[in-house]
Curated annotation (Swiss-Prot):
EC primary class: transferase
Similarity-based family: Belongs to the AdoMet synthase family.
Classification via Pfam families: S-AdoMet_synt_C (PF02773), S-AdoMet_synt_M (PF02772), S-AdoMet_synt_N (PF00438)
Chain residues that bind K(+): 45
Cofactor: Mg(2+); K(+)
Binding site residues for ATP: 17, 177-179, 244-245, 253, 259-260, 276, 280
Positions annotated to bind L-methionine: 58, 101, 253, 284
Cofactor remark: Binds 2 divalent ions per subunit. Binds 1 potassium ion per subunit.
Gene Ontology process terms (BP): one-carbon metabolic process; S-adenosylmethionine biosynthetic process
Name of the protein in question: S-adenosylmethionine synthase
Organism: Bacillus cereus (strain ATCC 10987 / NRS 248)
Pathway: Amino-acid biosynthesis; S-adenosyl-L-methionine biosynthesis; S-adenosyl-L-methionine from L-methionine: step 1/1
Assembly notes: Homotetramer; dimer of dimers.
Cellular component aspect of the GO annotation: cytoplasm
Length: 399
């Protein structure tokens, strides 16, 4: 069946968005703990509103970290430094409510079901079962060099650029909160051919005019990020379409950890299992298995075994082996999906302990993922973005 030309849209947000503030606080706390106690169990949730930060969750660790100090340093780094913003690093209240991990959950994670029943030794599985049941997806496609869908790739780059021109004073009137959205047109073969629409909403100083913002963002943000060949005379631009965006950040909207899961992943282009990432250590398969699924999918595409690949993993709490592994190549595979699943089983250890070891996840690496996407990053070295398994997959597939 012939495909029709169609549009697809993805969005991103800046690090000053209320939900992203929360993600960064949660991951900053996680990193601080992991830097002193690599085996800590952390599930850290944050909420922000006008003048207030609440940090809650379950943390089991042998170390101590100064949570209010970490919170204030994170907010300072984002750029909320003035009380007139309705939220700033010095004057905001910080409340904490931290418990230890449930003993019932810890029992399942500490010693997986297979080990307790004698099916494997503790040494083989490193005594780690999945921290919860659930399903996770990973995706890759050959639309961009980083093997990500083009709409989310461009949306992230625009959001990052908004922050850059604010922090380096190119556009000193910008404030931390902002959102971007990109609509891409695909041809009959499913290939991206042009950018149809760009939406940017950015918080700003009250005295700047809309005309100035419109001109500056087109010149210093859009032109700097979006390849000129993707923009034509029909491309539509909506810059601060309400006309004014002065009240923003936690003063404008309350924020919560884990509320930007589509921004964090593939911009809606691939399926999502529902679990959020930030504030969770690697024994939580919501995070570690989603990273592993991306690693698998990216290596499949990098090996030339498919033009696009979506990998689903699923787990039961306290059980180390995934209960299911599936691969969907959307008709682009060079080998059957059954063969791909077998290749995945033979080349990737997808037990939680295996993932942690394979991707070296007991490190303080998470704050850098908490804004501008966890996947397709070229500005930081993330283990799940490497394509070091591609050659072996290609050889074993006989290609």
């Amino acid at each position: 069946m012939t495909k029709k030309r169609h549009l697809f849209t993805s969005e991103s947000v800046t690090e000053g968005h209320p939900d992203k503030i929360c993600d960064q606080i949660s991951d900053s706390i996680l990193d601080a703990i992991l830097s002193k106690d690599a085996n800590a169990r952390v599930a850290c949730e944050t909420t922000v509103t006008t003048g207030l930060v609440l940090v809650a969750g379950e943390i089991t660790t042998s170390t101590y970290v100064d949570i209010p100090k970490i919170v204030r340093e994170t907010i300072q780094g984002i750029g909320y430094t003035r009380a007139k913003y309705g939220f700033d690093a010095e004057t905001c209240a910080v409340l904490t409510s931290i418990d230890e991990q449930s003993a019932d959950i810890a029992m399942g994670v500490d010693q997986a079901l297979e080990a307790r029943e004698g099916q494997m030794t503790d040494a083989e599985i490193e005594a780690i079962g999945a921290g919860d049941q659930g399903l996770m997806f990973g995706f890759a496609c050959n639309e961009t060099q980083e093997l990500m869908p083009l709409p989310i790739s461009l949306a992230h780059k625009l959001a990052r650029r908004l922050t850059e021109v604010r922090k380096d004073d190119t556009l000193s009137y910008l404030r931390p909160d902002g959102k971007t959205q990109v609509t891409v047109e695909y041809d009959e073969n499913g290939k991206p051919v042009r950018v149809d629409t760009i939406v940017i909403s950015t918080q700003h100083h009250p005295d700047v005019t809309w005309e100035e913002i419109d001109r500056d963002l087109k010149e210093h943000v859009i032109k700097a990020v979006v390849p000129a060949e993707l923009i034509d005379g029909e491309t539509k631009f909506f810059i601060n379409p309400t006309g004014r965006f002065v009240i923003g950040g936690p003063q404008g909207d309350a924020g919560l950890t884990g509320r930007k899961i589509i921004v964090d992943t593939y911009g809606g282009y691939a399926r999502h299992g529902g679990g959020a990432f930030s504030g969770k250590d690697a024994t939580k398969v919501d995070r570690s298995a989603a990273y592993a699924a991306r690693y698998v999918a990216k290596n499949i595409v990098a090996a030339g075994l498919a033009e696009k690949a979506e990998v689903q993993l699923a787990y039961a709490i306290g059980v180390a082996q995934p209960v299911s592994i599936s691969v969907d190549t959307f008709g682009t595979g060079k080998v059957s999906e059954d063969v791909l699943v077998e290749l995945v089983r033979n080349n990737f250890d997808l037990r939680p302990a295996g993932i942690i070891k394979m991707l070296d996840l007991r490190r303080p690496i998470y704050k850098q993922t908490a804004a501008y996407g966890h996947f397709g990053r070229t500005d930081v070295d993330l283990s799940w973005e490497r394509t070091d398994k591609a050659a072996a997959l290609k050889e074993q597939a006989g290609l």
